[in-house]
């Protein structure tokens, strides 16, 4: 039977959605498009061969005559532009009410409860860039042991701790405490551990030991349907965290995009059946939020250079799906995600070549198609386009 290798290139949007301005974004945001404008020499030949430049509305790449895959783009139906919302929608959940955000920081009651249960004082408690806030409070934390708490435009409760001051296990335990607190009326989509190292301002750097503590999905996803059918759901990167482990049969966390590709390949080489579901987060975390278009461009080129290896390790019936989960235009103001169309590229030995899938009304169509390919129950939301692929 077919096996699906599903890779999320985190935040690689391809242009503003019609409602982008309602989410605080300009109609000119385009993660990939604006990177191309700054770096027209970007080399992503393998994604171009898959048809990324042939997607409707993409005018910054020349289209190619004979793409080797199917290609298209999806709108987001959910009310959000974050990781949780994007991944949940692509697996069949429409988030019709935005997750709660805390634009002025967390209430006195929340912070006092957190301090009481963790035994540590809080500093920060405001929306901030993660790299900026560790510079602001990193030295203070070394002196006092106080924990840095902050949020963003997303629905997140983030805890930053120097690994040399607060051990990782304590940081992770504090996140579990925060997850218990941030429920009900105060429910945030994710509590995030943000460990870093360094001795003084200007030298603090995040480590790769991040962990996300998500809400449980509101209803069954495609992942649950695949697992319940007795197939594998193998999660690479932060996929396990995004779904709080629901619908996952095995998982591995990763240190970088290239580590994510390596672990995806490791799973591909094993005797399994079902779904390998990978998230490559560096595009978003290292380059999108930090507004680093040059770094983003290099990361895209690095991923693109690994695609031949991924394709070479596919079995006869394997199907490769590559898509994003939202945008994060590194040329745009601020540090937050951007609400964009996402690209979809699909490849396999038995898949049509050069077929334009057009524009899909929801990310959930991707998950419905994955379910259909694997002959399992379709999710509540989304329409399969499997019939267009063969």
Curated annotation (Swiss-Prot):
Keywords: Cytoplasm, Isomerase, Manganese, Metal-binding. Mn(2+) 1 binds at residues 10, 325-326. It catalyses: 2-deoxy-alpha-D-ribose 1-phosphate = 2-deoxy-D-ribose 5-phosphate; alpha-D-ribose 1-phosphate = D-ribose 5-phosphate. Pathway: Carbohydrate degradation; 2-deoxy-D-ribose 1-phosphate degradation; D-glyceraldehyde 3-phosphate and acetaldehyde from 2-deoxy-alpha-D-ribose 1-phosphate: step 1/2. GO terms for cellular component: cytosol. Its EC number is 5.4.2.7. Gene3D superfamilies: Alkaline Phosphatase, subunit A, Phosphopentomutase. Its cofactor is Mn(2+). InterPro entries: Alkaline_phosphatase_core_sf, DeoB, Metalloenzyme, Phosphopentomutase_DeoB_cap_sf. It is found in: Cytoplasm. GO terms for biological process: 2-deoxyribose 1-phosphate catabolic process; 5-phosphoribose 1-diphosphate biosynthetic process; metabolic compound salvage; nucleotide metabolic process. Belongs to the phosphopentomutase family. This is Phosphopentomutase. The gene is deoB.
